[in-house]
Amino acid sequence: MGQQHGTRNGLTHRELPRGVGLLLAMALMNVALYLCLDQLFISPGRSTADSRRCPPGYFRMGRMRNCSRWLSCEELRTEVRQLKRVGEGAVKRVFLSEWKEHKVALSRLTRLEMKEDFLHGLQMLKSLQSEHVVTLVGYCEEDGTILTEYHPLGSLSNLEETLNLSKYQDVNTWQHRLQLAMEYVSIINYLHHSPLGTRVMCDSNDLPKTLSQYLLTSNFSIVANDLDALPLVDHDSGVLIKCGHRELHGDFVAPEQLWPYGEDTPFQDDLMPSYNEKVDIWKIPDVSSFLLGHVEGSDMVRFHLFDIHKACKSQIPAERPTAQNVLDAYQRVFHSLRDTVMSQTKEML
């Protein structure tokens, strides 16, 4: 009897920790899953980037701890090693280059008749340095060169090709894609309220051209890169803009950017009415639709964005929302869907 009593107590002593251990393991798994969910649905923001901003005239990139002064003409000529050409546009040719073991993008003016556009883009880069714009490393007006941080993932045009790679499958979700759309709208909002006044992204007459103006960073953020065509709208003085001097076609551009006098009247630039920053708002739904792609859940996001996108496509510019209005709507949808999915997931545990 004594032996049996001892055995019975021994079994109880061994079994109790097993049960407690199982409960503890399940609790830890739930905590880990909650943390993963919170990380997956992390709200978009660039506080880290903000804390790393340098004063005007200085830059920092990659693993640099301290800010350095923009490189001078002499430093660009002697310290930058040109590697290979990676792009070319109407104004400049771009080369992957190296500076002190940092990969950088060296832009060279290719046509002297485009120097005014080149210098305009440089002035915009210098004045609009922020988390929304590619980092300026140096420049030389005399040589027609601009040096910026290099982003190996390239322009937004490459987004689908990039996200289809197996190593990026974890970020190929509607959550991350919606965050990209929010960052795109944030850039438009920044340009419309920039330190240089209301600026319009004019190099955007079709979707491929628009996407080519932005770069995808290695941490899957978006920065504006090509600022050669950012005319100023001044509502107080009644100054409006026109994107170029040629007739525009298609439904990607806003209705007010189209020739209003019919096919029987030949296009004349001096007769073409001017317009304001609401042309950027018209294009947001098309760019966002591209960014959302066709992954699981992206159509659900489109459904929730239907009303704000419908407002963006108003034929009357004044009735379109502001970029801030659009951004607010995107954030509401993001948080609403995040809370819904997290709630459903936690209920399944």
Curated annotation (Swiss-Prot):
Gene deletion effect: Hydrocephaly: mutant mice exhibit dome-shaped heads of varying severity. Surviving mutant mice display numerous behavioral abnormalities: tremors, and inverted screen testing show 5 of 8 falling off, suggesting impaired motor strength. Impaired sensorimotor gating/attention is suggested by decreased prepulse inhibition, and impaired learning/memory is detected with trace aversive conditioning testing. In testing nociception, decreased paw flinching is observed during both formalin phases, suggesting decreased sensitivity to acute and tonic pain.
EC category name: transferase
Protein topology in the membrane: Single-pass type II membrane protein
Intervals, Cytoplasmic compartment: 1-19
Catalytic function, reaction form: 3-O-[beta-D-GalNAc-(1->3)-beta-D-GlcNAc-(1->4)-alpha-D-Man]-L-Thr-[protein] + ATP = 3-O-[beta-D-GalNAc-(1->3)-beta-D-GlcNAc-(1->4)-(O-6-P-alpha-D-Man)]-Thr-[protein] + ADP + H(+)
Glycosylation sites: 66, 164, 219
Record's keyword annotation contains Transferase: yes
Primary location class: endoplasmic reticulum
Lumenal-facing ranges: 43-349
Gene Ontology CC entries for this record: endoplasmic reticulum membrane
Single Gene Ontology BP annotation: protein O-linked glycosylation
EC number per UniProt: 2.7.1.183
Chain ranges of the Protein kinase domain: 80-349
Gene Ontology molecular functions: ATP binding; carbohydrate kinase activity; phosphotransferase activity, alcohol group as acceptor; protein kinase activity
Keywords noted in UniProt: ATP-binding, Endoplasmic reticulum, Glycoprotein, Kinase, Membrane, Nucleotide-binding, Signal-anchor, Transferase, Transmembrane, Transmembrane helix
Top-level division of the source organism's lineage: Eukaryota
Listed transmembrane segments: 20-42
PANTHER family, alphabetized: PROTEIN O-MANNOSE KINASE
Known function: Protein O-mannose kinase that specifically mediates phosphorylation at the 6-position of an O-mannose of the trisaccharide (N-acetylgalactosamine (GalNAc)-beta-1,3-N-acetylglucosamine (GlcNAc)-beta-1,4-mannose) to generate phosphorylated O-mannosyl trisaccharide (N-acetylgalactosamine-beta-1,3-N-acetylglucosamine-beta-1,4-(phosphate-6-)mannose). Phosphorylated O-mannosyl trisaccharide is a carbohydrate structure present in alpha-dystroglycan (DAG1), which is required for binding laminin G-like domain-containing extracellular proteins with high affinity.
Family of the protein in this entry: Belongs to the protein kinase superfamily. Ser/Thr protein kinase family. STKL subfamily.
Protein name: Protein O-mannose kinase
Organism for this UniProt entry: Mus musculus
